[in-house]
Amino acid sequence: MRRLWMVMGVLVFLAPLLRGQGPRKFELRANAQEFWKLVGHDARLTQVAAGFGFTEGPVWDPAGFLYVSDETLNKIFRVHLDGKRDTLISLGDPDGNTFDRRRRLIDCASALRAIIFVSTDGRYHILADRYEGKRFNSPNDVVTGPDGALYFTDPTLDLPKGEKQEIPFQGVYRLSRTGKVLLLTKELVQPNGLAFSPDGQRFYVDDSDRRNILVYEFTPGRGLSHGRVFGEEPGGTGDGVPDGMRVDAAGNLFVTGPLGIWIWDAHGNHLGTIVMPEQPANLAWGEADYRTLYITATTSVYRLRTNTRGFIPY
């Protein structure tokens, strides 16, 4: 969602200065003791790599590196833990990524208005680019569901300049392994990040326009039902909006939002916030035990070791 963040990213750094404060610093803000069970008092944030345009869509590869989208430089990079990077593919406005059950890298290709998979040789293949004959808006984020299908959001946040919106709403969709596209909901203004609970019975999606997170009951073969507001992430101008999300194995929700990463328990209690020096857009669990958060935040990629284990849906 580069278009929104190009404006907000500038405000993130200007707003503190206008208030007479210095640039934002890493900080742990707990609202409940449970926060410290997930993020230790001695947690340290490390900058893995810098010098990007706008980072998004981190995915950990068990080979020991990250795939990271850069929406400004129009590339998907392999980012190594020593900070080095190499280009997997040059692609207009890549966004959220995931692996599917076949371990293929799946990307929301906003400029193509499509869901694609990118092979290890840097070639891409379109999996879906239309719903009922009309082109998607600008697919934003994608996850693998408990049934092995792909689930993705399609806001207008990165609709290519000069191109028309063909679908008259911003939807959340299911893409089956046979290529069938099913609309799940069109009630959100700008759907963005999404995730499933570890037991596969809950589906979370945030709305960047309304600054809230919704939760639905999920039933394979039936889709979503009983949607309700799970939590809200209010913030000031330039503080950021709800964006990427991940869950841990215990069902806690980690959502990038105003000032940093908001942590919620499964009951909708806001346990605390990890304040970031740069506004984060997305995050992923990584390393052999999946206890490390890798965070894409504007021009950098960061690493934060936690006390919890991430849930990996593929």
Q: For each predicted feature, which ranges?
A:
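Blade/loop signatures of beta-propeller domains
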Residues: 22-46, 166, 312-314
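Blade-edge beta-strand/turn elements of extracellular beta-propeller
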Residues: 33-50, 82-90, 119-133, 171-190, ...
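Beta-rich, blade/repeat-based domains predominating
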Residues: 50-65, 90-114, 132-150, 166-171, ...
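Beta-propeller domains
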Residues: 66-87
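Short loop/turn segments immediately following the C-termini of beta-strands
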Residues: 71, 110, 155-157, 208, ...
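A short loop-to-beta-strand structural motif that recurs across blades of beta-propeller domains
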Residues: 75-77, 114-116, 170-173, 212-214, ...
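Short, conserved, GDST-rich strand-edge loop motifs in beta-rich repeat architectures
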Residues: 152-167, 306
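Short loop/turn segments immediately following beta-strands, especially the blade-tip
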Residues: 216-223, 306-312
